[in-house]
Amino acid sequence: WPKGDPEQEYDLVVVGGGISGLSAAHFFRKNDPSARILVLDNHDDFGGHAKRNEFQVNGETRIGYGGTESIDTPSGYADVSKELLKDIGIDVERFYDYYDQELYNSLNLSYAIAYDSETYGERKLVRGYGSRPWEEFAADTPMSERAKADLVRAFNAEVDYLPGMSREEKIGLLSKISYRTYLRDYVRVDEQVLEMYQRWGMSFWCVGMDEVPAIYILGYSDGGGLPGLEYTVKREGGRGSEPYIFHFPDGNASVARLLVRRLIPEALPGSTMEDSVTARLDYTRLDQEGADLSIRLNSTVVNVEHTADSRAVDVTY
């Protein structure tokens, strides 16, 4: 890519304005408060996958997350990650006050599976997935007798479906095959059970279970859980007893916004994690001429290479 003479010089140029890129800028400045830093991102907004959606409904604003949702299991974070949350003003203990963990139980709600008539011969909603005994849940479904038995076996049988393999070999295989393939070829469940789980991943991974690696299911307990791996590969680590409650109304977009507030305070008014959610961000403040730190959007980096003496890096965008 042809390059001309440098137009600007910085102590640090970060390619990508997602949470990682913004964090890199934060830590660099923390180490050197006088550093000149430029963050470049090809999108029209910062945050990367941490997107925020805003809608107007009957004159009222509705906020939701458009990408990454949660600060998952913060107790297990490395010290440097915990330090970052503290630096930008996030107190994870506050989520215990804001999140009503008994809401669904108080309304007598539970996980349920919707069965369609095309696959199962009857259109039926069966409640209690993950909270009732599996024999009882399966009995209420419109599945065939074999499929019911296979569902119960997949959950209850203490079976290693990859016998004779080491843990490393199992993880290697499960990383290469889909969860659907694993259920079909190794757990050997009925086609109706495969179809029951096929669209499970659409709300989380955005693809069907024929495209979700089987290893992703290890220790997965959301929505009542997924069967077949518990006795095949022992889970190491995980959430433990920590609840899945650490998320803002706009998901991790608030993490990105709080990073921007820390880097460029005048861009996002306020001083708390709470007031950041509804504060209006001033995008004109992100890239001010002469500023020591700039976040430059709509800027696609096309080349990065060391100078001849390797004392600097030329970034072309």
Which residues does each predicted region cover?
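Catalytic nucleophile loop
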Residues: G21-L22, A78
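Active-site/ligand-binding neighborhood in enzyme catalytic cores
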Residues: N156-S299, S310
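Extreme N-terminal leader/targeting segments of oxidoreductases
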Residues: W1-L12, K30-R36, R52-V57
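Conserved acidic E/D residue at the C-terminus of a beta-strand in Rossmann-like folds
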Residues: V39-D44
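Gly/Ala-rich phosphate-binding loop of Rossmann-like dinucleotide-binding domains
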Residues: A25, R29
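Glycine-rich Rossmann-fold phosphate-binding loop(s) that bind the pyrophosphate
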Residues: G16-S20
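Dinucleotide-binding Rossmann-like beta1-alpha1 core, especially the glycine-rich loop
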Residues: G59-D150
